[in-house]
């Protein structure tokens, strides 16, 4: 057997849903006794891996393309068989915290015997969700180092955009359920390969160490410990949640390393362009909008389209905000002769100002996001003649989802790097 054949066989084995289910059982996640799914696991074991002739073929649309979710939210790949609601003594619904508001799906019933692992992996998977991003990036920009924060956003946008587009090109379904238990359902209508959670969970810690080491004084060993811990936690959490095969996670990790090798040397050039070039805002807005339109043409509706527009809008808004802040002198990076920067001692004043910036800043961010959401969706529906009585259906149109996500999160990003730092400066907590 040649090396290529061995690698192909290994890839097939790593994509088998049975391996995901085995990992879940190892971590204490099982189908509860009496669940309708419990009787289906044995049948699933004989379906085989991708490429195996015994494997049940994926249902296709009328044009031969992979099946997509309908208005009720049938996801890509195999639709989950949801168990009945638990009674007072029934098992916990382990995935209900990530209910998908756009498709109405919820996590499956599962018997979780290891709660510490469950909460650990819930935390790990949140490191790749919007809640984490909307806290993490502003915290860097407001409290730690805007220089590093801006560049982290550039890398994050690049990695996530390429990952989301690659998903819609490859179009591999999520692991079949059964035998896999879907503890999280929020992203189930997206494709699987590669894992963008794994990509984000790899790119952020690596980029964070690359950007800070030598700029800040700290032992390198801290970074060498942080990178594998962060990345492995996020990657394993996606297998634990039943969202990805082992192959998806490995591919996401390796894909991220390749992207960083190619594009990391350009990050400094991109950030300097965003801040200093006279017409940078026009180019930034136009380029990100074109990339968003392109990504929307790769496939029909899924939650990944809105996520892509959200990522691009955030990146464009943060870049434009940094341009305005730089040219108005609101946010200036320390001069090179002051490097490396020493980590200041934690005082009551320093800690108090940091907390104030986080609380005031996040309240303003949430306010801006809520206002823009209420304005952009009805406005887009009115402009393009789309009924807006059912927001779920309306947001499945590109004419609504793209401007809503792009404008809303573009405004949020602009607020993070310009409007909110200006307010901090005005009230004396910058």
From Swiss-Prot:
UniProt cross-references to InterPro entries, sorted A to Z: P_Acid_Pase_2/haloperoxi_sf, P_Acid_Pase_2/haloperoxidase
Chain spans, region Disordered: 34-100
CDD domains: PAP2_SPPase1 (cd03388)
UniProt modified residues of type Phosphothreonine: 103
Stretch list, region Phosphatase sequence motif III: 237-248
A biological process term (GO) from this entry: phospholipid dephosphorylation
Residue ranges of the TM segments: 121-141, 152-172, 193-213, 216-236, 246-266, 279-299, 311-331, 348-368, 409-429
Region (Phosphatase sequence motif II): 194-197
Site residues, Stabilizes the active site histidine for nucleophilic attack: 248
GO MF assignments: dihydrosphingosine-1-phosphate phosphatase activity; sphingosine-1-phosphate phosphatase activity
Family to which the UniProt record says this protein belongs: Belongs to the type 2 lipid phosphate phosphatase family.
Record's protein name: Sphingosine-1-phosphate phosphatase 1
Organism name: Rattus norvegicus (Rat)
Lineage: Eukaryota, Metazoa, Chordata, Craniata, Vertebrata
Gene it is expressed from: Sgpp1
């Amino acid at each position: 057997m040649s090396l290529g054949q061995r690698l192909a066989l290994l890839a097939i084995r790593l994509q088998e849903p049975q391996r995901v289910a085995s990992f879940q059982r190892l971590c204490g996640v099982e189908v509860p006794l009496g669940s309708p799914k419990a009787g289906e696991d044995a049948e699933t074991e004989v379906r085989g891996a991708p490429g195996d002739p015994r494997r049940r073929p994926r249902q296709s649309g009328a044009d031969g393309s992979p099946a997509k979710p309908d208005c009720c939210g049938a996801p890509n790949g195999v639709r989950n068989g949801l168990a009945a609601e638990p009674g007072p003594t029934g098992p916990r619904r382990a995935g209900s915290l990530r209910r998908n508001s756009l498709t109405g799906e919820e996590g499956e019933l599962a018997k979780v015997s290891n709660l510490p692992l469950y909460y650990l992996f819930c935390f790990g998977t949140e490191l790749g969700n919007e809640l984490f991003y909307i806290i993490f990036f502003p915290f860097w920009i407001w409290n730690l180092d805007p220089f590093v924060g801006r560049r982290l956003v550039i890398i994050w946008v690049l990695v996530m955009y390429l990952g989301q587009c690659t998903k819609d090109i490859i179009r591999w379904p999520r692991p079949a359920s059964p035998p896999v238990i879907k503890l999280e359902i929020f992203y189930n209508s997206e494709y699987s390969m590669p894992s963008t959670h794994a990509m984000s969970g790899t790119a952020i810690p690596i980029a964070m160490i690359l950007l800070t080491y030598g700029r800040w004084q700290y032992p390198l060993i801290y970074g060498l410990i942080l990178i594998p811990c962060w990345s492995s936690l996020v990657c394993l959490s996606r297998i634990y949640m039943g969202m990805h095969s082992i192959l998806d996670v490995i591919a996401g990790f390796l894909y991220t390393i390749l992207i960083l090798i190619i594009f990391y040397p350009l990050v400094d050039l991109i950030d300097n362009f965003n801040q200093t070039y006279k017409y940078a805002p026009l180019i930034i807005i136009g380029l990100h909008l074109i990339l968003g339109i392109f990504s929307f043409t790769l496939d029909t509706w899924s939650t990944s389209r809105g996520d892509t527009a959200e990522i691009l809008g955030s990146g464009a808004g943060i870049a434009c905000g940094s341009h305005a802040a730089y040219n108005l002198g609101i946010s200036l990076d320390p001069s090179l002769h002051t490097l490396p920067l020493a980590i200041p001692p934690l005082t009551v004043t320093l800690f108090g100002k940091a907390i104030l910036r986080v609380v005031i800043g996040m309240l303003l961010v949430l306010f801006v996001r809520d206002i823009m959401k209420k304005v952009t969706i009805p406005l887009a529906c009115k402009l393009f003649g789309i009924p807006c009585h059912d927001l779920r259906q309306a947001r499945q149109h590109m004419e609504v989802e793209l401007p809503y996500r792009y404008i809303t999160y573009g405004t949020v990003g602009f607020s993070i790097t310009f409007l909110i730092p200006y307010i901090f400066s005005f009230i004396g907590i910058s």
